[in-house]
């Protein structure tokens, strides 16, 4: 047989192979029912994965409130109760770019069940890539940034994160913090009117952290994070605009975590150095002196946890307890579901438990009792800014698919 004749046979086989591939794609479901795997289709299908979760939440909140009286004094009105009920739906999209890089996106919808107004919002909350450059892990885009186990920051950010190492990991990160957080409550009084609200500009950030295992079950972490230009801009007021406080803060943290069988004991110390470049009222006072006088610059968190519910394991459960005593200069967007009173300092505790009702259905319950640390120093002013004390009972059920 000549090479030309052999080429003709190969050409015919290739043509038939292309036809077979087209037929396999057309009848993929039927072939799958017959137990015939279509490898190429499976490989392509694995490139993109769509998952989701739906969380039903109810929170009952009870806190002491104070309000200004006509003679500009303050009085406690007693307990003011309210509740939050909502449904949060999330759709996750994970795609394989190549062997080293992946893409993750997340679309979120939240429906407010407190009224019949149809309040809801939908937004693209995550869009980032993960990959490797040499021996370095890279994450870039809009993702959930966690700093100091969430005791400093735990919410979305637009940024870049680099990490290197295995048993000892060194991490660097920088970017823009979300504006969807209460950096600090404010109160403006011009002698006639008083206006309160929240300053929400998260500013920019950069930081370094190192974490590793010191011994079996004993892990340590330490780091430094710098936040810049938080709360920039101005506040519209009846008699003009007032500059918002341009806040910078550098926060150190160091923590230990120890596994004891099914238990985990953790502790973390934090220290901040907050400063402001502008005034947030018309006085000529030095706001940095006020910061040093009234806003604590250090704090700590102690936690104890037992096991934990796993979505894939029906009947699994866990419990936890934490105590917080964090000054205003030690956090920006805290991970806790308790009331942290903006960025003004808080102390208190939280306890909770979680249980997997059925595969991919997890229930959570928690109780939080916190109070404002600023209230201890400025009982009149702090009362106008936010709750002085807060008790909340949190429940939710999350379905994943």
Task: Identify the residue ranges that each predicted region occupies.
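Alpha-helix capping and helix-loop boundary segments enriched in small/acidic/polar residues
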Residues: 197-198, 243
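Short, structured coil/loop segments at alpha-helix boundaries
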Residues: 17-24, 38, 42, 98, ...
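Outer membrane beta-barrel
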Residues: 3, 53-56, 78-190, 200-223, ...
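Outer-membrane beta-barrel pore domains
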Residues: 2, 57, 64-82, 115-119, ...
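Short amphipathic alpha-helical surface micro-motifs
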Residues: 31-38, 142, 300-304, 344-345
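N-terminal periplasmic/intermembrane-space "pro-region" immediately following the signal or transit peptide
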Residues: 1-55, 60-70, 75
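Low-complexity, polar-biased intrinsically disordered regions enriched in Pro/Ser/Thr/Gly
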Residues: 183-197, 282-287
């Amino acid at each position: 047989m000549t090479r030309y004749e052999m080429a003709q046979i190969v050409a015919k086989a290739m043509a038939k192979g292309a036809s077979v591939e087209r037929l396999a794609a057309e009848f993929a479901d039927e072939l799958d029912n017959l137990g015939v795997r279509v490898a190429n289709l499976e490989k392509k299908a694995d490139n993109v994965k769509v998952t989701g979760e739906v969380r039903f939440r109810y929170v009952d909140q009870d806190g002491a409130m104070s309000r200004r009286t006509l003679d500009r004094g303050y009085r406690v009105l007693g307990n003011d109760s309210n509740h939050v009920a909502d449904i949060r739906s999330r759709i996750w999209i994970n795609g394989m770019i190549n062997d080293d890089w992946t893409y993750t996106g997340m679309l979120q919808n939240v429906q407010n069940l407190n009224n019949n107004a149809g309040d809801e919002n939908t937004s693209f909350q995550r869009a980032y890539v993960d990959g490797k450059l040499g021996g370095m892990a890279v994450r870039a885009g809009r993702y959930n940034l966690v700093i100091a186990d969430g005791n400093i920051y735990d919410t979305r950010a637009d940024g870049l994160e680099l990490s290197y190492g295995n048993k000892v990991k060194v991490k660097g990160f920088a970017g823009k913090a979300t504006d969807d957080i209460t950096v600090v409550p404010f109160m403006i009084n011009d002698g006639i009117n008083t206006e309160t609200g929240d300053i929400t500009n998260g500013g920019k950030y950069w930081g370094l952290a190192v974490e590793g295992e010191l011994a079996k079950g004993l892990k340590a972490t330490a780091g430094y994070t710098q936040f810049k230009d938080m709360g920039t801009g101005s506040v519209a007021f009846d008699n003009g605009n007032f500059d918002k406080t341009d806040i910078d803060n550098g926060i150190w943290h160091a923590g230990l975590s120890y596994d004891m069988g099914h238990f985990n004991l953790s502790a973390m110390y934090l220290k901040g150095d907050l400063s402001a470049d502008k005034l947030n009222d018309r006085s000529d006072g030095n706001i940095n002196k006020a910061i040093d006088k009234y806003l604590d610059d250090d704090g700590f968190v102690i936690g104890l946890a037992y096991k934990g519910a796993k979505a894939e394991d029906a009947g699994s459960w866990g419990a936890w307890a934490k105590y917080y005593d964090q000054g205003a200069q030690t956090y920006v967007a805290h991970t806790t579901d308790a009331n942290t009173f903006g960025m003004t300092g808080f102390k208190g505790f939280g306890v909770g438990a979680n249980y997997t009702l059925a595969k991919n259905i997890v229930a959570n319950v928690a109780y939080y009792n916190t109070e404002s640390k600023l209230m201890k120093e400025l009982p009149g002013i702090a009362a106008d800014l936010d709750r002085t004390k807060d008790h909340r009972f949190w429940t939710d059920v999350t379905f994943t698919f």
